[in-house]
Regions:
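Histidine/acidic-rich helix-loop-helix segments that form or flank divalent-metal centers
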Residues: 90, 130-132, 136-171
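Divalent metal-dependent catalytic cores for phosphoryl transfer on phosphate-bearing substrates
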Residues: 48-53, 60-61, 78-142, 178
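Buried hydrophobic packing segments
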Residues: 69-73, 126, 130, 173
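A short mid-domain helix/strand-loop element embedded in enzyme catalytic domains
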Residues: 28-47, 64-67, 92-101, 147-148
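Alpha-helical phosphate/pyrophosphate-handling elements in metalloenzyme active cores
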Residues: 55-86, 158-163
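Signal-transducing alpha-helical linker
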Residues: 3, 23-26, 39-43, 87, ...
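Non-catalytic interface/linker regions that flank or bridge core catalytic/transmembrane domains
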Residues: 1-52, 56-57
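Conserved beta-strand-loop-short alpha-helix elements that form
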Residues: 169-182
Length: 185
């Protein structure tokens, strides 16, 4: 688990901070290896609960969302190719957060209105990073739309039900689940 978080840190920072190519094959390979090391859903969720590293919250959270998304896709009978796309969507869903200053992102307590407005831009920042890359459109839509809600109350564009990509909806569920079960301040 810790090794894969280190991979996420390296791959995502190399892309966003150092402007290197996105090594999404490495993210997918390492995530799948970790996923298949868990024999059951219980073992997977137990690992997520017990192994979270608070200091690497963006990276641990991205890994967790990727693993949970893959499990949800398996339950929904996705094909192997669809599972890989969904796994990558989960892995990259918060890549835009790397464009937000660390002191804002890791601030304990509530954000100011200005800080929250900035944090709410991370889906758009992420989409802008990925839009020209040769990734499945579901990955890009999941990155952009994982905070959209079926009632139209989400962001960044306030999409509702049928306008939200299926992969984005699944990543959104995984994202909310992981956030709700995290020990965050």
């Amino acid at each position: 688990y810790s090794r894969v978080i280190a991979t996420y840190r390296t791959v995502l920072e190399d892309c966003v901070i150092y402007h290197k190519s996105l090594n999404y094959e490495q993210l997918l390979s390492d995530t799948k290896e970790l996923y298949y090391s868990c024999k059951t859903s219980l073992e997977l969720f137990d690992m997520l609960h017990n192994m979270r590293s608070v200091e690497d919250s963006v990276y641990a959270h991205s890994l967790n969302v990727s693993l949970i998304s893959r499990r949800l896709g398996r339950w929904l009978k996705f094909s192997p190719e669809e599972l890989d796309t969904l796994t990558l969507a989960g892995a990259l869903h918060d890549i835009g957060k790397l464009k937000i200053p660390v002191e804002v992102l890791n601030k304990p307590g509530k954000y100011t209105d200005e800080e929250f407005a900035l944090v709410k831009q991370h889906p758009k920042f992420g989409y802008d990073i990925l839009k020209s890359l040769p990734l499945d459109s579901h990955v890009k839509k999941a990155v952009l739309c994982h905070h959209e809600r079926s009632d139209g109350s989400g962001y960044p564009t306030g999409l509702s039900q049928s306008d939200i990509d299926e992969y984005a909806a699944i990543v959104s569920i995984a994202d909310v689940y992981d956030a709700m079960t995290a020990a965050r301040s």
